[in-house]
Amino acid sequence: MASLDRVKVLVLGDSGVGKSSLVHLLCQNQVLGNPSWTVGCSVDVRVHDYKEGTPEEKTYYIELWDVGGSVGSASSVKSTRAVFYNSVNGIIFVHDLTNKKSSQNLRRWSLEALNRDLVPTGVLVTNGDYDQEQFADNQIPLLVIGTKLDQIHETKRHEVLTRTAFLAEDFNPEEINLDCTNPRYLAAGSSNAVKLSRFFDKVIEKRYFLREGNQIPGFPDRKRFGAGTLKSLHYD
């Protein structure tokens, strides 16, 4: 198989929100039958056609790094986790629509991943502790995905989605809400699939066509993975 250029996308969020199920769905187009807790980091690869259907179309590997752990972990754990944040080209923040705390904690995940973790360990960030303008100069493409949409009754969905609207205001990304146990939410041609493709296109553009400001500051560039198979890699 010919070597393909690749980009690295972090998948961050609290344990139990469905990150592993999401990554499996994105990379294998299948529902994950028996999801388990991620220890350390699990990496899977998605094949993406950049600018599909245009003269500029080109195939890339999207490395999705599912980072385990809790945002309230001890400093030593967070320090170890930081190694996974090297040379990142994009971030997908994942939260559970049925768990308000998991949505609020994305603010702390963003601070940690963007190397601006100024909040004491174990303290949940509230609006009073958090400065939205910290992200005004962020150049890393971001996407927010809410999971377990199927567990919210139709009559409650508007209320829940309004409650999590601050995520889009804080990070200024597009937002996708879905059920990881139902592939139809990412069916070709759907609005979610279009948003996802647009996000990956932006990540690729930042990495290969806009060379400035396309990686998390404070982390040196590391060697890229060599060409290989689509086999999942696990870091424990």
Curated annotation (Swiss-Prot):
Keywords: Disease variant, GTP-binding, Nucleotide-binding. GO terms for biological process: B cell differentiation; intracellular protein transport; natural killer cell differentiation; protein stabilization; regulation of protein lipidation; regulation of Ras protein signal transduction; T cell differentiation in thymus. CDD domains: RabL3. One of its GO terms (cellular component) is endomembrane system. Pfam families: Roc. Belongs to the small GTPase superfamily. Rab family. This is Rab-like protein 3. It comes from Homo sapiens (Human). The lineage of its organism: Eukaryota, Metazoa, Chordata, Craniata, Vertebrata.
